[in-house]
Structures are given as structure tokens and as C-alpha cells.
Amino acid sequence: MEGDQFNLAESIFSRSLMTVPNVGLWTIYLNYVRRMNDLRNDATGNNRTTVSQAYDFVLNNIGVDRDSGTIWQDYMEFLRGIPGQIGGTSWQDGQKLDIMRKAYHRAIAVPMSTVSALWKEYEQFETSANKLTARKYIQERSPIYITTRSAHQVLEHIHRGLDRSTIPKLPPKAGFEGHEEFLQQVELWKKWIAWEQSDQLVLVKNGESDVYKKRLLYVYKQAVMTLRFWPEMWVDAAEWCFDNGLEADGTEFLTSGFAANPESCLLAFKYADLLEKKSPEAGKGPKERGEAVRAPFDKLLTSLYDLFKQVKAREAKELVKVEE
């Protein structure tokens, strides 16, 4: 955002935010919103409302990330500045208390490096709000914090060596340099996904099925961002979504996965199967259904023929070099 190129920045955000679940990018977006809405010059309170909405938007999308701790801490600092006095008796004081308590409850349920610091803040917050009720609230949340803290330690071990790059790499051919390392990355991603599926945070049992699904969906989005050219990961993500009632997300995984890997037979068959199942729902006749199902296979064959032509052209060039 150097040179005050705000229109360009907003264009980048509109194109990339919802497709790139990266804490760094979302932090830049949040800083941009805060820069454009100065809280020091906010007589109407509109700027604070805009920033508050931005925090909600960011945390709803990447707040489950283990690297989102700094954003959560910044958010709590922002909430301390809203009108009202913790421990006060006015309606405004009570409103601020409820907002901050809800935010702390969300934060201490996320396995991240700052969870212990946030827990200490929460204890101080409840004590300053009401010493008589502080013990009750702290005891209620203590098991969640202990589970979260332990989960963070496990995730830290799982993430050791994991490449969460937003720049995807083509899988090296078997026997070529980097092939074994790439497969190791695939296994690390699978290990993280398996851990999330095992529900070590006890979310489903505690009635937090939506959070459980949100966490897994987020991990799958992270995985296909790095393993963009690994078809099996797209298929795994889609099938998990279909098994858990996330039809739209499952369809998006198959559509995006096939767009990224048009030469993948696996994705072509899975996508065609999806189209075949959806055709009756869309009221299509036999001919239209046949055309819809055929489209992925046409795309697959075109992509494979194109690859074949590229290989032949490369061989011809190499042959010319040898003859020279």
C-alpha cells in the first residue's frame, strides 16, 4: 500500500481474500481497514463500527488458524477501547462485558501460541468484572483451556517441517529430485487432517459441531492451496464435505480441483459423477444430462492430447540438438 494505491489494494483484497486463507494476507487487510478508519478521529463512532466489523470478518474466516494469536490479542485490545467500564453497572458497561467475555471464550478455544497469555488476560478480566462470579466463569472455562493448550503442543509437533506456502509446486516425478520430500509433505498434511478429524478438541461432544466442521474445512483449504497439483487431496476434501453435509463446499473443491488439474482422470471421473447426480435435480433431460457428464471427459482428453503434443514437440527439439 505504498504510494497510497488504495484502489489497487482493494482490488487485490476482493480477488484474493476468500480464496487465500493465509494469516499474513488477512493481517494486511485488517491493517488496511484500520488505516482507512482512524479511531483517533471518530466523533460519530462509524470508524469503530467499521473496524469492529472487519475484525469479525477476519476472525470468522481465519480465527481458527494456529497462527492467528496476534490478531486475537489485537482484537481484545481493540475491545478494551469500546465505550463502557468493566465492573460498571450501566447497560453500556454490561454490553461491553458480554462482548469481551464472548470474545475471550472464542479465543481460548483456539490452539495457538498465545493461548496461555490470553487465558491469563481472561482470568484478570473476570476478576476485575466481579470477584464473586469470577471463580465460576474461570472454572467453567478451565477444562477448555487445558484441552486447547495441550492441543497446541500436539499441533506444534505436527506442523514441524510442514510447508504451508501459498505458492504451489508441481509434484516431482518418481525418482527425480524432490519427489521424496514432496511425498513427506503430503503425509504431514494428511497427519494434520487426521488429527482434526479425531476431534481432540472435543468439539462435537460439547455441541460445537459447526466449529469442528469449520476447522476441518479450513485445513482442507490450506492443504489444497499448497498441494494444488495433487488431485487426491482435492478429492479427499470434496468427499469429506459431501459426507458432512457441506454440498456447496464439496462441489467447489471438485470444480476448482479439476480446473487446476484438467489432466487428472481421478478428478474427471469424480466431477462427472457429481454432474450426473445433480442433473435430475436441475430438471435436465437425458440428452442434457449426457452432454453435462461428457464435458469433463472431453476436457480431460483435450488436456491429455495437449500434453502429448507438448512432449512430442520437446522430443523433436531435443532430436534437432542431437543431430546438430
Please give the residue ranges for each predicted region.
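Polyampholytic low-complexity alpha-helical segments
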Residues: 1-324
